């Protein structure tokens, strides 16, 4: 039962004190005082356990009896004051008529999980407060009637914020709510217990090796199969291997997308901020992929048991199933060659790298055909798988890019752009031929003109230096040929035949130029 008292100073806010009933201590304590009015006048009917009565008076309360509350009697534990009342309460407090005001009930909180206290009265005489096993002592004021009949009341928690926080922290519903939240959205516990559970859990991390549960009895029970059945089992096994590859591919795609999302989130929030959000999802999805992959591998193991095949420890720990499949095919081919007698003699020295190593490197090259440049970690992984050194792997990729990868790229380019390239080459050849023919024609015409000019200049007996420079100067020196130079060097003089030829030619030209009607023949 809770009673609200106002401060004598005239405070307007109402304060709440939680009063819990305790029947055992009620019978032990007795006090005597006079009362003008009882609580039965205020509350109609029987007073029940844990019933709260709110009594905010409109005026100051006059206390007629000596009701003292010592500082040692009141205890404060966890920000709350708890009092206990008996079932039948007859108040010793003289009060005036009360009116009930329920104005600020939502802001007033009751405090639980506190040390039990007692408040008892008998025969309606006295009212005392006791509290046991308290950690802190609440200083209180004394209720007395020193002529003024004033009521002193001490209040420790009068701020709504601090009262709300303390009430939430000391609430009895706090632990159950925390447990429920931990079951639903517990991130830290999952991170802490994840490593312990992952060791014993079947769904481990995706890249950890899975246990292959194939017993020797299953292998021994493999019977002779017909070629058709064996072929069918081989096809099923190849399909299952492709399914394993697809699962690996999808998981890697999911992992890369999650890493990209986490990196973009960490760019804004800071390094490592995305780990609490992504780690749980990664572990859970990894378990799903792991279970799916294990189921497929169990089917593969069953088929291998029927075929009588065995896996080595290297194949069990291998992370590239396609390379494992290629290795198995090479072993089968080698066994077939041994049966047919096509094995290379042992005395013949082996040139180059082993076929098994080359097949693994070639498989990696074709898987990364668009960018066949392995990283350092990939070189180390390939060197472990092939049994070669890191330098041998690097040299093989250098030679393979030059001898194998580049010609294939060129062939692909020719297949895609072959027709257009041929048309361009044909057009270029035609233009070159036309340029050569035009150049030859021009050279012939220039050589003939130079010869004619040389002959005309030799027939003139007396010429000045300027005229000789004009005659023997090459109008187009850039296009002078060796034929013109030889014709000039082989000239031996001026003869009579040349003179007669020149005279006849000059007469003909004079006759043509003398007739004005023949000028239109030379107009271009």
Swiss-Prot record:
Residues 195-236, 429-463 are annotated as: Disordered. Belongs to the TALE/BELL homeobox family. Keywords: DNA-binding, Homeobox, Nucleus, Transcription, Transcription regulation. This is BEL1-like homeodomain protein 3. Residues 446-459 have a biased composition (Low complexity). Transcription factor that is responsive of the nuclear import of SHOOT MERISTEMLESS (STM). It comes from the Eukaryota. It comes from Arabidopsis thaliana (Mouse-ear cress). Residues 346-408 bind DNA. May form heterodimeric complex with the TALE/KNOX protein STM. Interacts with OFP1, OFP2, OFP3, OFP4, OFP5 and OFP15. GO terms for biological process: regulation of timing of transition from vegetative to reproductive phase.
């Amino acid at each position: 039962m809770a009673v609200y008292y106002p401060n004598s100073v005239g405070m307007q806010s109402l304060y709440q004190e939680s009063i819990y009933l305790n029947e055992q201590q009620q019978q032990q304590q007795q006090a005597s005082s006079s009362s003008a009015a009882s609580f039965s006048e205020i509350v109609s009917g029987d007073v029940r356990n844990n019933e709260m009565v709110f009594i905010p008076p409109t005026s100051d309360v006059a206390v007629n009896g000596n009701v003292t509350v010592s500082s040692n009697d009141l205890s404060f534990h966890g920000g709350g004051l708890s009092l206990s009342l008996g079932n039948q309460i007859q108040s010793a407090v003289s009060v005036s008529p009360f009116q009930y005001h329920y104005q600020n009930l939502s802001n007033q909180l009751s405090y639980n999980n506190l040390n039990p206290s007692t408040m008892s009265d008998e025969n309606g005489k006295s009212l005392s407060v006791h509290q046991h096993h308290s950690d802190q002592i609440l200083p209180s004021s004394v209720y007395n009637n020193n002529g003024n009949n004033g009521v002193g009341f001490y209040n420790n928690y009068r701020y709504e914020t601090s009262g709300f926080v303390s009430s939430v922290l000391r609430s009895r519903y706090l632990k159950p709510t925390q447990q429920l939240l931990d079951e639903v959205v517990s991130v830290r516990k999952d991170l802490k217990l994840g490593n312990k559970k992952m060791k014993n859990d079947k769904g481990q991390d995706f890249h950890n090796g899975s246990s292959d549960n194939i017993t020797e009895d299953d292998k021994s029970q493999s019977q002779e199969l017909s070629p058709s059945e064996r072929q069918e089992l081989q096809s099923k096994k190849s399909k299952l291997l492709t399914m394993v590859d697809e699962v690996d591919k999808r998981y890697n795609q999911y992992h890369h997308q999650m890493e990209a999302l986490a990196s973009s989130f960490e760019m804004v929030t800071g390094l490592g901020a995305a780990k609490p959000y992504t780690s749980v999802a990664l572990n859970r999805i990894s378990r799903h992929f792991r279970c799916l992959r294990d189921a497929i591998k169990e089917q593969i193991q069953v088929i291998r048991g029927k075929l009588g095949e065995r896996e080595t420890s290297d194949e069990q720990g291998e992370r590239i199933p396609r390379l494992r499949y290629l290795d198995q095919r090479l072993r089968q081919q080698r066994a077939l060659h041994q049966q047919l007698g096509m094995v290379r003699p042992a005395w013949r020295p082996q040139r180059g790298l082993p076929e098994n190593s080359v097949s693994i490197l070639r498989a990696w090259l074709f898987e990364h055909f668009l960018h066949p440049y392995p990283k350092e970690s990939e070189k180390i992984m390939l060197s472990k798988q092939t049994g070669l050194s890191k330098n041998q792997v690097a040299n093989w990729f250098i030679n393979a890019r030059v001898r194998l990868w580049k010609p294939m790229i060129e062939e692909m380019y020719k297949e895609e752009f072959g027709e257009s390239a041929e048309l361009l080459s044909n057009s270029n050849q035609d233009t070159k031929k036309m340029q050569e023919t035009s150049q030859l024609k021009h050279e012939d015409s220039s050589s003939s003109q130079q010869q004619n000019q040389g002959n005309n200049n030799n027939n003139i007996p007396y010429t000045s230096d300027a005229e000789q420079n004009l005659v023997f100067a090459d109008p187009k020196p850039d296009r002078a040929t060796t034929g013109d130079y030889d014709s000039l060097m082989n000239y031996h003089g001026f003869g009579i035949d040349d003179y007669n030829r020149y005279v006849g030619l000059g007469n003909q030209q004079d006759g043509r130029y003398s007739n004005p009607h023949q000028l239109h023949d030379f107009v271009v």
